[in-house]
């Protein structure tokens, strides 16, 4: 029964269209969000992700389409009656009120009996580990603590959905990492659907059950963090999520159902793909820096692999990143290897000749024209 409830749609966005003056921001946008899900909407500035959030919240009016919340059409219902709360980037705390009164504000607006307010506020503050700071003012709290107050205020009236609009972007790196873990743990504890908007790819991968990647008002890919990172469906998603190397390839022939022989940057390679291909067809081969294997070569040594020379290296603690210029076309390739101080060949010298291969089957293969 619990799985059925969890898999039940809590929000359905049906053919949403939103324009400002003559500019269309969202066009025929469709999305189903399940109960208890941590969904992140990810995309560059101006892609329409915040507009989607504001439409769900009821802060913007649709031009076309319907918004369904827990089976009820709320398209024409005002924001304050939607059982949806929002945590903004600015937190929007009242500076003249105590933390307790900030969290209690929404309950008082809803005319909740005074006898019920204190236990509910203290329960919310306990969830975010701030019950001992109930009498302080927001200015007496750190940025991370203010963030937690904003979350407590948002969840105290038990909304069906919590919206978070770039709500970690104002924090420093260390605190942001801590809050990512806390938010995910809190979401599991509450069982509330979280919809999180960000342009930070690492944040999305860390926190989400599911990611929507947007560009120009449309969904480019909808999938788990692992799917989005390891199996991007087009070049936009591949380039937007993390570092990636994109190689040009020309099909020679298909050798079996899952393997194609192709010329990749001047070298004949076997690539794994089930795409329907023809001889001389152009493809793109996508490899993450950690997918690539480096083998050092003597300067006069030959290899059937892709050849290049190390032009830069960067030690990053757990990993060593090497920048390599290919001999074939001067393309720059980024390679990331786990650092092993006992391996004499891991710390490649600038100028070192190298052969590049990759872990079999780790490549992503796309049609050459598949960029959006």
From Swiss-Prot:
Domain ABC transporter stretches: 11-241
GO molecular function, one term: ATP hydrolysis activity
Membrane-topology descriptor: Peripheral membrane protein
Recorded coiled-coil stretches: none
A GO CC term assigned to this protein in UniProt: ATP-binding cassette (ABC) transporter complex
Alphabetized UniProt keyword annotations: ATP-binding, Cell inner membrane, Cell membrane, Membrane, Nucleotide-binding, Translocase, Transport
InterPro entries: AAA+_ATPase (IPR003593), ABC_SmlMolc_Importer (IPR050093), ABC_transporter-like_ATP-bd (IPR003439), ABC_transporter-like_CS (IPR017871), Mo/tungstate-bd_C_term_dom (IPR008995), P-loop_NTPase (IPR027417), PotA-like (IPR005893), PotA_ATP-bd (IPR017879)
Catalyzed reaction equations: ATP + H2O + polyamine-[polyamine-binding protein]Side 1 = ADP + phosphate + polyamineSide 2 + [polyamine-binding protein]Side 1
Compartments (UniProt record): Cell inner membrane
EC number(s) from the headed UniProt entry: 7.6.2.11
Ligand binding (ATP): 43-50
Pfam families membership: ABC_tran, TOBE_2
Gene3D superfamilies: 2.40.50.100, P-loop containing nucleotide triphosphate hydrolases (3.40.50.300)
Subunit structure: The complex is composed of two ATP-binding proteins (PotA), two transmembrane proteins (PotB and PotC) and a solute-binding protein (PotD).
Family recorded in the similarity comment: Belongs to the ABC transporter superfamily. Spermidine/putrescine importer (TC 3.A.1.11.1) family.
Function per UniProt: Part of the ABC transporter complex PotABCD involved in spermidine/putrescine import. Responsible for energy coupling to the transport system.
PANTHER family in UniProt: SPERMIDINE/PUTRESCINE IMPORT ATP-BINDING PROTEIN POTA (PTHR42781), SPERMIDINE_PUTRESCINE IMPORT ATP-BINDING PROTEIN POTA (PTHR42781:SF4)
Name of the protein described by the UniProt record: Spermidine/putrescine import ATP-binding protein PotA
Organism for this UniProt entry: Histophilus somni (strain 129Pt)
Lineage: Bacteria, Pseudomonadati, Pseudomonadota, Gammaproteobacteria, Pasteurellales
UniProt gene name: potA
């Amino acid at each position: 029964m619990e799985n059925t409830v969890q898999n039940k749609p809590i929000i359905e966005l049906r053919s949403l269209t939103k324009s400002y003056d003559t500019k269309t921001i969202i066009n025929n946008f469709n999305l189903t969000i399940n109960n208890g899900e941590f969904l992140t909407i990810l995309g560059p500035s101006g892609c329409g992700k915040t507009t989607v959030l504001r439409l769900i919240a009821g802060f913007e009016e649709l031009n076309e389409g319907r918004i369904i919340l827990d089976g009820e059409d709320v398209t024409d219902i005002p924001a304050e009656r939607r059982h949806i709360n929002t945590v903004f980037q600015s937190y929007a705390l009242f500076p003249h009120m105590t933390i307790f009164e900030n969290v209690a504000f929404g309950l008082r607006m809803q005319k909740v009996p005074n006898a019920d307010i204190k236990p509910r506020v203290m329960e919310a503050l306990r969830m975010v580990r701030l019950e001992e700071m109930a009498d302080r003012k927001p200015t007496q709290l750190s940025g991370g603590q203010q963030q937690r107050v904003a979350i407590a205020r948002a969840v105290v009236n038990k909304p069906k959905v919590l919206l978070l609009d770039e709500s970690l972007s104002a924090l420093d790196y260390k605190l942001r990492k801590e809050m990512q873990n806390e938010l995910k743990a809190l979401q599991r504890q509450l069982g509330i659907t979280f919809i999180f908007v960000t342009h930070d790819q690492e944040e999305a991968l860390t926190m989400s059950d599911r990611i929507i990647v947007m560009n120009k008002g449309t969904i480019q890919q909808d999938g788990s963090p692992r799917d989005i990172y390891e199996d991007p469906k087009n070049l936009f998603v591949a380039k937007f999520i993390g570092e990636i190397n994109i190689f040009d390839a020309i099909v020679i022939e298909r050798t079996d159902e899952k393997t194609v022989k192709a010329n990749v940057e001047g070298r004949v390679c076997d690539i794994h793909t089930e795409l329907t291909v023809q001889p001389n067809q152009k493809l793109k081969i996508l490899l993450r820096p950690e997918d690539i294997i480096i083998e050092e070569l003597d300067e006069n040594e030959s290899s059937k692999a892709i050849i290049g020379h190390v032009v830069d290296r960067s030690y990053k603690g757990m990993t060593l990143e090497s920048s390599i210029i290919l001999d074939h076309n001067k393309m720059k390739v980024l390679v990331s290897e786990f650092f092993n101080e006992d391996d004499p060949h891991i710390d490649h010298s600038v100028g070192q000749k190298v052969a590049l291969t990759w872990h079999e089957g780790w490549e992503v293969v796309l049609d050459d024209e598949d960029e959006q």
